[in-house]
From Swiss-Prot:
One of its GO terms (cellular component) is mRNA cleavage and polyadenylation specificity factor complex. This is RNA polymerase II subunit A C-terminal domain phosphatase ssu-72. It is an enzyme of class 3 (hydrolase). InterPro entries: RNA_pol_II_suA (IPR006811). The lineage of its organism: Eukaryota, Fungi, Dikarya, Ascomycota, Pezizomycotina. GO terms for molecular function: protein tyrosine phosphatase activity; RNA polymerase II CTD heptapeptide repeat phosphatase activity; RNA polymerase II CTD heptapeptide repeat S5 phosphatase activity. Gene3D superfamilies: 3.40.50.2300.
Length: 266
């Protein structure tokens, strides 16, 4: 897998499944009602996680996104000359302007400027998963797309876009020691690291979100909104038990996007 979470070459030949044509291709009217809270994760919080973040927000889901790398790494003029930035300190807009000043032809041709242009419309800058203060109010992120509903700083489902990111998230959650005792589903969808596959992956993520949200709403109605929304283990058990079946059905619709799942704890 690419060590850089941005486009690194020609797109793969895999095509989206026929079932993706279900209204998952952009903004849509909000049908109202309950919405699960999502978090998307990749290495640098640039390409795949941001495509997922944008699409989930357009589908009216509360969503945040992160990267798991030590630094933000973007392709440079050669493989030995990447552009490197710090998480939480560098805005997408400043990265855009820096690369545009360095070599506009190169960074327009390889898709970085287009990607960064999208990202700066979604939120301020790349955030690192390991620095996320889970359960703390996200008061500085009210202008991010998908921020409504994420004010409490917790998610119901974390979707990673690469196995190493899934491993990093699971390891970090174990190290934190589950202080909130709140269940969270961590799902990895293996999305190849280029623009085309990120776009396909984004649609697949929304398809999965819709399926998960449907069963969550059903279980919430059974146990009561207050109990379910509290995130307590007992109130969420019905939903938790149904997730593997939903994921198996989703996998049949998206056979080119291998998925892995586990139940973890905040």
């Amino acid at each position: 897998m690419s060590a850089v979470d941005t486009p690194t070459g020609a797109a793969s030949s895999s095509k989206p499944d026929q079932n993706e044509q279900n209204g998952q291709n952009g903004g849509r009217e909000d049908s109202g009602g309950f919405k699960l809270k999502f978090c998307t994760v990749c290495a640098s919080n640039q390409n795949r996680s941001m495509e997922g973040h944008l699409r989930l927000s357009l589908a009216n889901y509360p969503v945040i996104s992160f990267g798991t790398g030590s630094l933000v790494r973007l392709p440079g003029p050669s493989i030995t000359q990447p552009n490197v930035y710090k998480f939480n300190e560098t805005s997408y807009d400043s990265i855009y302007r820096e690369l545009e000043a360095k070599d506009p032809r190169l960074y327009r041709a390889n898709g970085l400027l287009n990607m960064l242009g999208r990202n700066r419309q979604v939120k301020w800058g790349p955030e690192r998963w390991q620095d996320w203060q889970i359960g703390m109010p996200r008061t500085k992120h009210k202008d991010d797309k998908g921020a409504d509903g994420m004010e409490g700083g917790v998610a119901d489902v974390v979707i990673t876009c690469e196995e190493r990111c899934w491993d990093a998230v699971i390891e970090d959650l174990l190290n934190r020691g589950s202080p909130l005792n709140r269940p969270v589903h961590v799902i990895n969808i293996d999305i190849k690291d280029n623009h085309e596959e990120a776009s396909v992956g984004g649609r697949a993520i929304v398809d999965l979100a819709d399926s998960l949200n449907k069963i969550a709403a059903e279980e919430r109605e059974k146990v009561g909104a207050s109990a379910f929304d509290s995130g307590s283990v007992g109130a969420r058990s019905g939903f938790d038990e149904r997730v593997p079946d939903v994921l198996a059905e989703w996998q049949e619709r998206w056979p080119n996007l291998p998925a892995t799942w586990t139940l973890a704890w905040f």
